[in-house]
Amino acid sequence: MSGGRRKEEPPQPQLANGALKVSVWSKVLRSDAAWDDKDEFLDVIYWFRQIIALVLGVIWGVLPLRGFLGIAGFCLINAGVLYLYFSNYLQIDEEEYGGTWELTKEGFMTSFALFMVIWIIFYTAIHYD
């Protein structure tokens, strides 16, 4: 017997119904991906919205945007980008997920809260006298 360690093999891809299970991240970037699990797709919409809120909060905080213009801009960009993503890029049937309104409002309030916190923190840190 040798004193060396046994080399562990990498884990095999998970099988789902006899087919290879595709990762969620590879589905997000492919326009022809099939979304079999409704909750998985709604999670993607939720986290995509959080990323948009984080990025826009930093941009709005660095730029001296204030008031209604900043909030309205966030709402339009956030809803618009996601609508374009799921209707034009993925070309999914919105009715399978409860309609366009359900997908548009999925995770909106939490992303709005995140946006406000990040916007206030960055604006205060950079522009506060």
Swiss-Prot record:
One of its GO terms (biological process) is multi-pass transmembrane protein insertion into ER membrane. Expressed in neuronal cells. One of its GO terms (cellular component) is multi-pass translocon complex. The chain crosses the membrane at residues 45-65, 67-84, 104-127. Residues 1-44, 85-103 are cytoplasmic. It is found in: Endoplasmic reticulum membrane; Mitochondrion inner membrane. Keywords: Endoplasmic reticulum, Membrane, Mitochondrion, Mitochondrion inner membrane, Transmembrane, Transmembrane helix. Belongs to the EMC6 family. Component of the GET- and EMC-like (GEL) complex, composed of RAB5IF/OPTI and TMCO1. The GEL complex is part of the multi-pass translocon (MPT) complex, composed of three subcomplexes, the GEL complex (composed of RAB5IF/OPTI and TMCO1), the BOS complex (composed of NCLN/Nicalin, NOMO1 and TMEM147) and the PAT complex (composed of WDR83OS/Asterix and CCDC47). The MPT complex associates with the SEC61 complex. Interacts with NDUFS3, NDUFA4, NDUFV1, NDUFA9 and NDUFS8 of the mitochondrial membrane respiratory chain NADH dehydrogenase (Complex I). Component of the multi-pass translocon (MPT) complex that mediates insertion of multi-pass membrane proteins into the lipid bilayer of membranes. The MPT complex takes over after the SEC61 complex: following membrane insertion of the first few transmembrane segments of proteins by the SEC61 complex, the MPT complex occludes the lateral gate of the SEC61 complex to promote insertion of subsequent transmembrane regions. Within the MPT complex, the GEL subcomplex may mediate insertion of transmembrane regions into the membrane. This is GEL complex subunit OPTI. It comes from Mus musculus. The lineage of its organism: Eukaryota, Metazoa, Chordata, Craniata, Vertebrata. The gene is Rab5if.
